[in-house]
């Protein structure tokens, strides 16, 4: 009976350790995915600000040209 208890505790302990390792790896993968998403959103923000600046400069140039034509 004592042998069965020890074996059962050993199996449960090893199962818990295995589960803990799997959860840790899962968290690491999720963190990597979040980092990639953050990098992509930073790139999009950078592109958006560039497009916005070009649009502003084009509007200013068009306004100056319109005033110059008057």
From Swiss-Prot:
<keyword id="KW-0165">Cleavage on pair of basic residues</keyword>
<dbReference type="Pfam" id="PF12121">
    <property type="entry name" value="DD_K"/>
</dbReference>
<keyword id="KW-0878">Amphibian defense peptide</keyword>
<feature type="signal peptide">
    <location>
        <begin position="1"/>
        <end position="22"/>
    </location>
</feature>
<keyword id="KW-0964">Secreted</keyword>
<dbReference type="Pfam" id="PF03032">
    <property type="entry name" value="FSAP_sig_propep"/>
</dbReference>
<protein>
    <recommendedName>
        <fullName>Dermaseptin-H3</fullName>
    </recommendedName>
</protein>
<keyword id="KW-0732">Signal</keyword>
<feature type="compositionally biased region" description="Acidic residues">
    <location>
        <begin position="30"/>
        <end position="40"/>
    </location>
</feature>
<dbReference type="InterPro" id="IPR004275">
    <property type="entry name" value="Frog_antimicrobial_propeptide"/>
</dbReference>
<keyword id="KW-0929">Antimicrobial</keyword>
<dbReference type="GO" id="GO:0042742">
    <property type="term" value="P:defense response to bacterium"/>
</dbReference>
<dbReference type="InterPro" id="IPR016322">
    <property type="entry name" value="FSAP"/>
</dbReference>
<feature type="propeptide">
    <location>
        <begin position="23"/>
        <end position="43"/>
    </location>
</feature>
<feature type="modified residue" description="Leucine amide">
    <location>
        <position position="70"/>
    </location>
</feature>
<keyword id="KW-0044">Antibiotic</keyword>
<keyword id="KW-0027">Amidation</keyword>
<comment type="function">
    <text>Has antibacterial activity against the Gram-negative bacteria E.coli and P.aeruginosa, and the Gram-positive bacteria S.aureus and M.luteus. Has antiprotozoal activity against L.amazonensis. No hemolytic activity.</text>
</comment>
<dbReference type="InterPro" id="IPR022731">
    <property type="entry name" value="Dermaseptin_dom"/>
</dbReference>
<comment type="similarity">
    <text>Belongs to the frog skin active peptide (FSAP) family. Dermaseptin subfamily.</text>
</comment>
<feature type="region of interest" description="Disordered">
    <location>
        <begin position="25"/>
        <end position="44"/>
    </location>
</feature>
<dbReference type="GO" id="GO:0005576">
    <property type="term" value="C:extracellular region"/>
</dbReference>
């Amino acid at each position: 009976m004592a042998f069965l208890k020890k074996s059962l505790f050993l199996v449960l302990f090893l199962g818990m350790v295995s589960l803990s390792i799997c959860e840790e790896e899962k968290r690491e993968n999720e963190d990597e995915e979040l980092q990639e998403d953050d990098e992509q959103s930073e790139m999009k923000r950078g592109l958006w600000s560039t497009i916005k600046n070009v649009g502003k400069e084009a509007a200013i140039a068009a306004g100056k040209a319109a005033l110059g034509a008057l």
